[in-house]
Structures are given as C-alpha cells and as structure tokens.
Amino acid sequence: MKCPSCHHNGTRVLDSRPADEGRSIRRRRECERCHFRFTTFERVEETPLIVVKKEGTREEFSREKILRGLIKACEKRPVALEQLEEVTQQIERELRNSGINEVKSETIGEMVMEQLSKIDEVAYVRFASVYRQFKDLNVFIEELKELIKKEQGERA
C-alpha cells in the first residue's frame, strides 16, 4: 500500500483488529521509508443496491438519505442520534441481506415507518405525513386511528 505522505510503496502493518461490528478490519500501518503512520480499513466490496423510485428512475442506495429523513422526523423529539443511526444501519443490513439488488423506494419508506412507530409516535406521524403525502385531514386522522389501534393491540 502506498504511503499517503511520501507515496512509497513499502508499508508494514503494525496492528490489525476487527472494526464496525466485524464487517471490516482496521489496520495501523507504517511507511518503511518516512515512518509515517496511518490507518486503513478493509471491508468486503458490496454490490450496489439500486433504489427504484416511484416514477421509475433508479439511483444508488443512500443510507445518508434515510438518516436525514429520520433526523427530520425526530426533530425536537427525545430520540438520540445513535438510535437513528442504529435504525438506518438495521434497514440497510436487512436490505443487503435480502439478496436483492433492486428495491422499491416504497419498501424502504415502509421499513422506516415501521421502525419509527417503535421509537416515537410523533416522529412516525411526521414521516408518514410527508411520505404518504396526506391530501387532507381525513386521511391524516385515519392514519392516527390506525396507529392508536395498533398500539392498543400491542398492550392487550
């Protein structure tokens, strides 16, 4: 591996350890010429996951987009950023483990709503109102009734 400081090809590994819950390996390296120390990460190259949008366009999956949507929905709510990152990671892991290379944006939206309903009901309603594009108050009220019915069913 080339040294990022002097661009010499000779480096040696000083330390290796698992990182990112075992999905990558962190290596501490040192250049044989200038003795500059740096860290590299080795991970399996994943096949791209493609999201098929409602209008039929395709784009590469972006975990950042999911996280931004979660953060927006949970704005001024008592939800930790770590919890939202965990949800994002869980959704991505579930999609990648499914073995499919293309996923509909609707599927991702439903997964996000399912997770939000477990975390914070207000955030769930916020996300659902944007995601489902409620046209009027009656549709919004119906969604709230479904949420209440679901919550009462879980308590029973």
Curated annotation (Swiss-Prot):
UniProt domain ATP-cone: residue ranges:
49-139
Record text on cofactor binding: Binds 1 zinc ion.
Q: Which GO terms describe its molecular function?
A: ATP binding; DNA binding; zinc ion binding
The record ties this protein, via InterPro entries, to: ATP-cone_dom, NrdR-like_N, RNR_NrdR-like
Keyword ATP-binding among record annotations: yes
Under Pfam families, the record lists: ATP-cone, Zn_ribbon_NrdR
Give me the ranges of the annotated region Disordered. Answer: 1-21
Q: Where are the transmembrane segments?
A: none
Task: Identify this protein by name.
Answer: Transcriptional repressor NrdR
